[in-house]
């Protein structure tokens, strides 16, 4: 069984480096997807540089989304609800795009999908002997920064 870790990227090198270091002993491959568009639809430069992660270079598969998703709604009135809907379409596109990197997986491989700051704890579960097909990780909730730990609610992140 292989574990493939899939995430999207904007410009969070520090968080991605933390993620790679924590998961490296468990993961066979890291899939990193970056879009040429921000969630708000603005064209942005590509920020990912594989040379910033030399220790993990052989495990990283980097993929770029070149185009906007289908179904973007023109927003001439600057409507907040249309902005949100279009943002969700872009997020959905980035998660779906990860499928393009999963051509060499088998039925018993574990594919994990989460944002960079949602880092699963693989020490806590014996995946090889589990009968479950889907796992949802209960994770620690840090509110955007490591010094902002919030312990009043559980965070169910990586799936």
Regions found by a protein language model. Give the residues of each.
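Short His-Asn-centered micro-motif
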Residues: 5-11, 33-34, 113-116, 137-140
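Surface-exposed, flexible loop/turn segments at secondary-structure boundaries
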Residues: 11-13, 38, 68-70, 142-143
């Amino acid at each position: 069984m292989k574990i493939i870790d899939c995430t999207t990227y904007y410009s969070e090198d520090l968080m991605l480096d933390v993620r790679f270091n924590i998961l490296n002993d468990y993961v066979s491959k890291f899939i990193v997807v970056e879009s040429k568009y921000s969630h708000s639809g603005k064209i942005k430069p590509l920020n990912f540089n594989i040379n910033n992660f030399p220790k993990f270079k052989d495990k990283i598969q980097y993929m770029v989304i070149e185009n906007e998703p289908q179904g973007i709604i023109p927003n001439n009135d600057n409507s907040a609800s249309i902005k949100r809907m279009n943002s969700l379409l872009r997020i959905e596109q980035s998660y779906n795009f990860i499928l393009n990197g999963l051509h060499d997986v088998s039925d018993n491989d574990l594919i994990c999908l989460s944002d960079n700051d949602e880092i699963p704890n693989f020490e806590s579960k014996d995946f090889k002997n589990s009968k479950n097909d889907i796992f949802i990780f209960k994770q620690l909730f840090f509110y955007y920064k490591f010094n902002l730990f919030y312990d009043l609610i559980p965070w169910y992140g990586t799936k």
